[in-house]
Curated annotation (Swiss-Prot):
Keywords from the named record: Ribonucleoprotein, Ribosomal protein
Cysteine disulfide partners in this protein: none
Family: Belongs to the bacterial ribosomal protein bL35 family.
Encoding gene, per UniProt annotation: rpmI
Cellular component GO terms held in the UniProt record: cytosolic large ribosomal subunit
GO molecular function (one): structural constituent of ribosome
Organism lineage: Bacteria, Pseudomonadati, Pseudomonadota, Alphaproteobacteria, Rickettsiales
Entry annotated with the keyword Ribonucleoprotein: yes
Record-level GO BP terms: translation
Species this protein is from: Wolbachia pipientis subsp. Culex pipiens (strain wPip)
PROSITE patterns: RIBOSOMAL_L35
Protein name as annotated: Large ribosomal subunit protein bL35
Length: 68
């Protein structure tokens, strides 16, 4: 009899990635709308990715049982 495999949450699959050491990477938040109010340097700093802190990454890893 085969074991039931856990499913990965598809919303987490789209938004987060794991590094080789197990850290969780996501894109910077706050870039959808309202850019007129922000300074150019703030907009530039929000490009790219960021590493989640321990408490948030623990929650995200629960939804990615096999890592992606």
């Amino acid at each position: 009899m085969t074991k039931i495999k856990l499913k990965t949450k598809s919303s987490v699959k789209k938004r987060f990635h794991l590094t080789a050491k197990g850290k969780v990477i996501s894109t910077q938040s706050g870039k959808r709308h309202g850019m007129v109010k922000r300074s150019k340097s703030n907009i530039r700093n929000q490009r790219g990715t960021t590493i989640l802190n321990k408490s948030d990454s623990r929650i995200v890893k629960l939804y990615m049982p096999y890592g992606i």
